[in-house]
Each structure stands twice: as structure tokens, then as C-alpha cells.
Amino acid sequence: MNIESNNFPNEFTKIFKYTKSDLTSFSELSGDFNPLHLDQSYAKLLGFKDQVAYGALTIAYLSNIVGMHIPGEGALWSDLRIKWHKPIYPDTSVTFKARITHTSQTTNSIQLEITGHTSRTNDLLFTSNSIVLI
């Protein structure tokens, strides 16, 4: 695949729902058992309204978009920057909106911006910028 013969979309949107079950599964996969992510009472002691989703779980969802949708198969991340604006809590549906902001034929790559908003209230949760090799 290359930039000149691409057939991937310039924009893509997908909704992911964060669940407590996802947090438990992710803790087992990653070995990160920080109670902030797994224990509601502990999270509340720290001032949060509920358990806080793993940042790396969000990155896994970003990987789904990059590897399967925009640009898709054969894509390889070379750079990722992400900023979380608000915590993501269990039972929250998050709308991921991806758009290509730049293409380079020289490096056969794209720059991709992906933002995450709560599906219900449209609160901005994170912004990310990536360089993806095609």
C-alpha cells in the first residue's frame, strides 16, 4: 500500500464502550493492578467519581482504528502523542473521531488526529496525533 494508491477514508468515526469487565481484563493482560483502575472506593478516596480507565486501553482502541480502518492493514505507527483532558470512567461510550491532517508521498506516511468525546455529552476526553507509515 502507498499514498498514491490509497483507498482508505480521510475521516472515520467509531464508538467504544468502556466497561468494568474491560478494566479487569486489561489488568490481567498488562499486569497493572493499580487500584485506581479496579477499585471504585479507592478511586473515590482520590477524588474521582469512579474507577478510571487505563490510558493504555484507550491506546489499544486507537490501534484498532489505525490498524483496521484508517489507514488499515499494513499500517505502522511511527509516532503517537496523546493528551487526556478528563478521566474516562466505566460504562462510558466514547466517540473516536479520526481524520487525516497531512499526507507525505516522500515518507509514504500520514498524520492522523484522533479525538475522543463522550457520546452522551460530547465532552472532550483526549486528543491524539500520530504519524503512520503506509
What are these model-derived regions, one by one?
Residues 1-11, 88-134:
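HotDog/MaoC-like acyl-thioester-processing domains
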Residues 1-76:
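Hot-dog-fold acyl-thioester-processing enzymes
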Residues 37, 48-49, 61, 76-77, ...:
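Short, intrinsically disordered/low-complexity patches at protein termini
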Residues 18, 84, 132-134:
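Hydrophobic residues in beta-strands and at strand termini
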Residues 25, 33-36, 43-45, 59, ...:
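A broad, structure-centric signal for solvent-exposed, well-ordered loop/edge residues
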Residues 68-92, 96:
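Mid-chain, well-packed structural core segment of small domains
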